[in-house]
Amino acid sequence: MRVLGIDPGSRITGYGIVEQAGSRLIHVDNGAIFTDSALDFPGRLKSIFDGLTTVIAEYEPDEVAVENVFLSNNAQSALKLGQARGAAIVAAVHAGLPVAEYTALQVKQAVVGRGKAAKEQVQKMLTALLSLPEVAQADASDALAVAVCHLHSHHLVRTSASAVPHRATSWRNFKP
């Protein structure tokens, strides 16, 4: 399975593509979409949508994972971040892809094993997990972490679902 991880931002939106082959995680690509500060805000949202649409067309991911909004003391910043997330999610949905969302705590827990891990610890672990030649740009690194989190979570859901005994879906199928 190939996953596009997205770390949305109104100025910089990071993306990372990770593929799972058996138990191996393979780094496909990563990068960032830098919006032009001269554009008005709707123009920046269009840049995010267009950039991610291009990435989706080029790499053909199976699923998309997006980092969830953090709480901010600045309401205006939180609103803009939410709108950038919306542009990213719409790009994925427009391509017919399923979208999962994860908090920063969930991402750190999945990658490092500790929800309170420092950004540097996450980057170091990603470099090792994905055999990266160097640490990725900060936003791209966050996006790679979101993709890895989704692959780990998806694997856990499939594994636990297969371990759950089948339940009767109606009384006719009930067998004591």
UniProtKB/Swiss-Prot annotation:
List the GO terms this entry assigns under cellular component, sorted alphabetically: cytoplasm; Holliday junction resolvase complex
Question: Which EC number(s) does UniProt give?
Answer: 3.1.21.10
Q: List the CDD domains hit by this protein, alphabetically.
A: RuvC
Q: Which reaction does it catalyse?
A: Endonucleolytic cleavage at a junction such as a reciprocal single-stranded crossover between two homologous DNA duplexes (Holliday junction)
Q: Name one GO biological process term.
A: DNA repair
Subcellular location(s) of the protein: Cytoplasm
Which coenzymes or cofactors are required? Mg(2+)
The organism's place on the tree of life at top rank? Bacteria
Q: Where does Mg(2+) 1 bind?
A: D7, D139
Q: Which Pfam families match?
A: RuvC
Gene Ontology MF terms: crossover junction DNA endonuclease activity; DNA binding; magnesium ion binding
Q: What is its main location?
A: cytoplasm
Q: Which PROSITE patterns does its entry note?
A: RUVC
Its biological purpose is as follows: The RuvA-RuvB-RuvC complex processes Holliday junction (HJ) DNA during genetic recombination and DNA repair. Endonuclease that resolves HJ intermediates. Cleaves cruciform DNA by making single-stranded nicks across the HJ at symmetrical positions within the homologous arms, yielding a 5'-phosphate and a 3'-hydroxyl group; requires a central core of homology in the junction. The consensus cleavage sequence is 5'-(A/T)TT(C/G)-3'. Cleavage occurs on the 3'-side of the TT dinucleotide at the point of strand exchange.
Its quaternary organisation is: Homodimer which binds Holliday junction (HJ) DNA. The HJ becomes 2-fold symmetrical on binding to RuvC with unstacked arms; it has a different conformation from HJ DNA in complex with RuvA. In the full resolvosome a probable DNA-RuvA(4)-RuvB(12)-RuvC(2) complex forms which resolves the HJ.
Q: What is this protein called?
A: Crossover junction endodeoxyribonuclease RuvC
The species is Pelobacter propionicus (strain DSM 2379 / NBRC 103807 / OttBd1)
Lineage summary: Bacteria, Pseudomonadati, Thermodesulfobacteriota, Desulfuromonadia, Desulfuromonadales
